[in-house]
């Protein structure tokens, strides 16, 4: 019985995405809050609700690079919560240092 409890806790702990931190220490979306998942989103409703979000193709080294990575696919850099559900970044905000 204890074995199943330990395995369940381990699997639950690994289900959370690790923050994408670059080699120089830049963290696109600081973890620990609602907006901890870096995403590239193409839909944006009223500045908070976003859709069609996907993880960046590589780990950005700066806010400017994060913006450029997303712009390559016609999307905008965002920090989102609930991004794993049907590719819908339900709650997103603009990362610090990103202009658009």
From Swiss-Prot:
Keywords recorded for this protein, A-Z: Cell wall, Disulfide bond, Secreted, Signal, Virulence
Xref: Pfam families: Hydrophobin_2
Disulfide partners: 29-79, 40-70, 41-53, 80-92
Domain of life, source organism: Eukaryota
GO cellular component: extracellular region
Keyword Disulfide bond: yes
Induction record: Expression occurs during infection and is directly regulated by the transcription factor FTF2.
Range of residues in the leader sequence: 1-17
Family designation: Belongs to the cerato-ulmin hydrophobin family.
Quaternary structure note: Homodimer. Homodimers further self-assemble to form highly ordered films at water-air interfaces through intermolecular interactions.
Role this protein plays: Aerial growth, conidiation, and dispersal of filamentous fungi in the environment rely upon a capability of their secreting small amphipathic proteins called hydrophobins (HPBs) with low sequence identity. Class I can self-assemble into an outermost layer of rodlet bundles on aerial cell surfaces, conferring cellular hydrophobicity that supports fungal growth, development and dispersal; whereas Class II form highly ordered films at water-air interfaces through intermolecular interactions but contribute nothing to the rodlet structure.
Full protein name: Class II hydrophobin FOXG_02746
Native source species: Fusarium oxysporum f. sp. lycopersici (strain 4287 / CBS 123668 / FGSC 9935 / NRRL 34936) (Fusarium vascular wilt of tomato)
């Amino acid at each position: 019985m204890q074995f199943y409890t330990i395995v369940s806790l381990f699997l639950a702990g690994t289900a959370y995405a690790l923050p994408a931190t670059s080699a120089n220490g830049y963290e696109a979306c600081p973890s620990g809050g609602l907006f901890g998942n870096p995403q590239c989103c193409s839909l944006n409703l009223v500045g908070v609700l976003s859709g069609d979000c996907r993880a960046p193709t590589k780990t950005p080294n700066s806010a400017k690079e994060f913006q450029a990575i997303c712009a390559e696919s016609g999307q905008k850099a965002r920090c989102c919560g609930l991004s794993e559900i049907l590719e819908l970044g339900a709650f997103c905000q603009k990362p610090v240092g990103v202009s658009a």
